[in-house]
Amino acid sequence: MAHTAFETSLDTLLEEPKMYRVLLLNDDWTAMDFVARILMEVFDKTSDEATAITLKIHNDGKGVCGIYTYDIAELKMQIVSQMAKQHGYPLRVITEEMP
């Protein structure tokens, strides 16, 4: 039985969205308490989770804040960049596509 255009279109619409990691990068100027605050306010991390991720960023140079669809990852990246700029920090945030 041949697929109709509707069935083919429906199959295309049901694909899983690509997921993206949002990462914060370490620098020598951004205060660790500010990074923890970002993690709690923007990424909904608990205080313990925020502390653990902040230490990972400090020790390893970067840390994963969360995994989201593209639009959400980009929005969170913009929010973090804006908050860092408002507070005078050079905090960098990037996204990476999940394999």
Swiss-Prot record:
It comes from the Bacteria. Pfam families: ClpS. InterPro entries: ClpS, ClpS_core, Ribosomal_bL12_C/ClpS-like. GO terms for biological process: protein catabolic process; proteolysis. Involved in the modulation of the specificity of the ClpAP-mediated ATP-dependent protein degradation. Binds to the N-terminal domain of the chaperone ClpA. Belongs to the ClpS family. This is ATP-dependent Clp protease adapter protein ClpS. It comes from Helicobacter hepaticus (strain ATCC 51449 / 3B1).
